[in-house]
């Protein structure tokens, strides 16, 4: 079984569209877990209406409400509640194409016995146009083939997120579907006073132990909302500097291209100066002294952020 998980905060009006895409799935053995991160809109009544209309036909709809703490804390709750072997995060403003879960399950049936594989990863598509977002796999690389029961083949390559991103140069949005057990092994840190944690912090930690099977298929359709987390990313990072600096500090320890490390060092200092003086003294997220040469540049960008954001 798959757990489709939706964290939501004041986005109740968008849930019906996602619900309709789940009803259209060709594969039906899944549960839909919604974790409401303390919404003040009518999310509760909207979910209750969906549940009464749906009556658990095909798949159950499970709703949990918690105090506001940020998307990452909602993910932690969802992972604890999940009954599925795989955990698919579907944001309230996005949808799944009808064959998404079917494709994932068919690939997973031939993958799950390999304990080095922590999940499946496909590509995102544009909800409004349907096209691939990003570069896809570069031409000329060797892709493996999976023969599925319906006589279709799927191209794939096994590798960590960093190998695919930085080694092969794949750009754009991808959708990771993890083993639920892997996310239980790597929960998001919940830091007092912070409501944001970059997902890449955990995805990188997962990549230090597990590969993903990256398939050449669109399994997720996205539409960015003007009030969404993507458009407010700088503000979110400024307001949650401990988790943010932790993310960039860990990036500096990985085997990644130098230009990415330099960018990470600059961003570390950029958000380090969002910490209070007391928290700077207490800061346990340290980086090697070689990266101190980027302190001044990071500070300049920090000052610009304060004027723009």
Predicted regions and their residues:
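C-terminal subregions of glycosyltransferases and related glycan-biosynthesis enzymes
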Residues: 213-309
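Conserved nucleotide-sugar donor-binding catalytic segment
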Residues: 130-231
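A conserved acidic beta->alpha catalytic loop
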Residues: 21, 36-46, 91
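Glycine-rich, basic loop-to-helix element that forms the pyrophosphate-binding segment
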Residues: 65-82
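Short aromatic/hydrophobic "clamp" motif used to bind/position activated sugar donors
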Residues: 87
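Conserved donor NDP-sugar-binding/catalytic core segment of glycosyltransferases
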Residues: 99-141
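Short, well-formed alpha-helical segments that are part of the catalytic scaffolds
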Residues: 11-24
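Short beta-strand/loop segment that forms part of the nucleotide-sugar
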Residues: 29-38, 62-66
């Amino acid at each position: 079984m798959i757990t489709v998980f939706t964290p939501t905060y004041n986005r109740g009006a968008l849930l019906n569209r996602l619900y309709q895409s789940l009803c259209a799935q060709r594969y039906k053995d899944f549960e839909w877990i919604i974790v409401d991160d303390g919404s003040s809109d009518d999310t509760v009544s909207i979910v209750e209406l969906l549940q009464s209309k749906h009556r658990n036909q095909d798949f159950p709809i499970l709703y949990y409400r918690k105090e506001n703490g940020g998307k990452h804390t909602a993910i932690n709750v969802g992972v604890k509640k999940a009954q599925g072997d795989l955990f698919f995060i579907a944001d309230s403003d996005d949808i799944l194409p009808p064959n998404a879960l079917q494709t994932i399950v068919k690939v997973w049936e031939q993958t799950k016995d390999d304990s080095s594989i922590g999940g499946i990863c496909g590509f995102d598509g544009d909800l409004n146009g349907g096209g691939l977002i990003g570069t896809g796999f570069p031409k000329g690389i060797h892709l493996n083939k999976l023969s599925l029961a319906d006589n279709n083949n799927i191209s794939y390559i096994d590798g960590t997120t960093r190998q695919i991103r930085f080694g092969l140069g794949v750009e754009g949005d991808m959708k990771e579907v993890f083993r639920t057990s892997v996310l239980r092994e790597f929960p998001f840190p919940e830091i007092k006073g912070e409501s944001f944690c970059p997902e890449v912090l955990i995805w990188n930690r997962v990549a230090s132990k597990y590969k993903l099977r990256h398939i050449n298929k669109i399994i997720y359709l996205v539409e960015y909302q003007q009030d969404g987390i993507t458009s407010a990313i700088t503000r979110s990072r400024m307001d949650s500097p401990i988790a943010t600096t932790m993310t960039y500090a860990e990036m500096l320890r990985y085997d990644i291209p130098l230009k990415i490390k330099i960018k990470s060092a600059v961003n570390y200092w950029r958000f380090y100066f969002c910490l209070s003086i007391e928290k700077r003294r207490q800061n346990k997220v340290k980086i090697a002294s070689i990266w101190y040469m980027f302190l001044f540049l990071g500070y300049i960008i920090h000052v610009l952020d304060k004027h723009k954001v």
